[in-house]
């Protein structure tokens, strides 16, 4: 296969969000003390699931995107064939199921439900008032996918569920910003489109701020790392960085708000 279709296939997988969720999984595995092998396995499972969601999104929207001439969509523009994308989806789904169940049935079932939420979004919920629900469910369940994996399965602290859900809602609202006009032209009327640009920014930033406030509380729930002065210094630096990124979320253009989030 020549490099051009490979690059187009990677682009069709929505590499930004896919990499973000996969990286978050790896960070959660480290923060919750999962063994290295378990962390690698659950991260690979999440990567496979996210690839299937990204590719299915481009494939399902191909006809609609082609109608308005979206050259940034590899399937719609013909940069990669639908047949190749279908094959990639099949392989990624098979890998997702195998890797998920290898993490243990509790983690596996939870992760497959998470992937199902992503597919439900692609298949229709993205055009409804409830478009943020799959994101809330998926991001909210992600910590459990990690902590339930391996030989010592356990549920995460309750605040992680809520933090993940808020992060998912914020990510959805901010990720949709650059595509609001194109989506509206194809009849998509999800929550960000109903709120508009400013409303999505404000609500998205608010959701992320709420998630951050809960994340700060992880330290008291036993997820803290460094303690004393170094721990407090790290917390202050993290809050300062979050403030700067928050301004990018509210004032930025293009993909910058999502990247900052």
Q: Could you say what each language-model-derived stretch is?
A:
Residues 1-261:
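Multi-pass alpha-helical membrane architecture of UbiA-family
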